[in-house]
Amino acid sequence: MENDSKKSGISKKRVANLRGNSLIISPQLFDYIKEFNLPVSPVTEQEKASAALKFRLKVANSLDLYLAEVLKSEVLKPLKTPGHYILAGEGGDRVIPESLLYSTGLSIPEEFRAASKLAYKLNAILRSFFKRRGCDLISVSAGFVSMEDKIVINGGFRYSDIMVSHPGQSRRIKDYLIYGKPEDAGNYIKFLNKILD
């Protein structure tokens, strides 16, 4: 991977891996999260896969396209309080109810409670981080890893996991936030990297 980045001319900067849809947390953001003692896994991708929980949580501060369609409301409308939904399935993109999480054996209540506490704490931390930069955190998605009988956040965030808006953003950024179109991903990656610098 390192040789590939040298050949392609991609910067060695720790903010982004532009070849994939992954986001290596910027040192500034990582340090900010660490101040709150939030457990984020430092393990390798292979270790994460073997110990990864079979669900992800998405904490929303504003309505995304899925929620707006379900609630027949406006996309990006702020919520009064953050809400969450559970994502599972092949690509971790299918919404399922909590009861199915247990009845299908994907998780147990203790795991889910620990994961949801971490997700909400991560959301609060990131909201504050981005608010200081004049931005709004629309939503954050997080996966989880079981390490030494503890649940920790999977630190391998993707750009699509952290959705941030800014009053001066371009129409293409807004389109990416609403529709998640792959052709607008490059603009969003640059936008997020600029905020994380």
Language-model regions, residue ranges each:
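A long amphipathic alpha-helix within ATP-dependent nucleotide-binding catalytic cores
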Residues: 107-138
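Active-site loop/lid in soluble adenylation, ligation, and acyl-transfer enzymes
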Residues: 1-88, 195-196
